[in-house]
Amino acid sequence: MTLHAILVTLIVPPPNLILVAILGFVLLRRSPRLARWLLGGALAGMLALSLPAVAQGLLVPLEWGLPRAPPPGAPPQAVVILSAEVDHVRGPGEQVRLGPLTLQRLVAGVALARRTALPVLVSGGRVGGKHVTPIAVLMADAMRDTFGLPPRWVEARSKTTWQNAEFSAAILKPQGITSVWVVTDAWHERRALLAFRHFGLTATPAPVEWDVDAGGWLPGARAWTVSYFAFHEWIGWVDYRLRAWLAGPPPAIAASNKAA
């Protein structure tokens, strides 16, 4: 795991709240008042993030303002389906299968490809050791064997959304493809679009909606999961904005802008 991944893990819940609670315990003797505030804040945060209404309040703004149609004059030329997670299967060696989120994206992407008659690129690298099958290969197998619609391209190197965009652009742009549908979860679209546009692709969202209980005020494990995704995406979006600003446009895009 990289230092960047470790830092991101520590600043999303529950690790961030656990760290606050640990700090509170450490300070109990030296600064009891501050310790009580830290412990109380950690407990209140854990309770709040387990409430469906709070979880949705964190997640839904990620979906606001997403365009629902391609920009004029730039119709998508391909469908890009991003991988999500895998489930590890018991057995000899490292075996994985497509997880629920990846399957939902795959189903939505196949439906879009059939509706638009556009070619498909699936994107996702290995999750685990070097002997684990890349997610994109599993997605391609499922498209061919289950849906009878094999993808035209398989991008099997990426480990992050940023790399999804970078490596997909490297495959598609030499083929003359500069505009794509991006199929991923609605809460993930904002960050994915930022990355794809940074690498010179006109990206139109094709979001997979995720049902969240809007009015629930009873704590639950699902709300914790939603809160985690929300924090992860907000942090990732800020990270990608900063990364794009620091990196500037890729060389090919910078050169074309200069020529123009």
Give the role of each language-model region.
Residues 238-260:
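Extracytoplasmic/luminal low-complexity segments enriched in Pro/Gly and acidic/polar residues
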Residues 2-7, 54, 58-62, 231-234, ...:
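Hydrophobic alpha-helical segments of integral membrane proteins
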Residues 7, 19-20, 37-40, 230:
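Hydrophobic alpha-helical transmembrane segments
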Residues 1-28:
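Membrane-embedded alpha-helical segments of integral membrane proteins
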Residues 37-52:
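Hydrophobic membrane-insertion alpha-helices, especially the h-region
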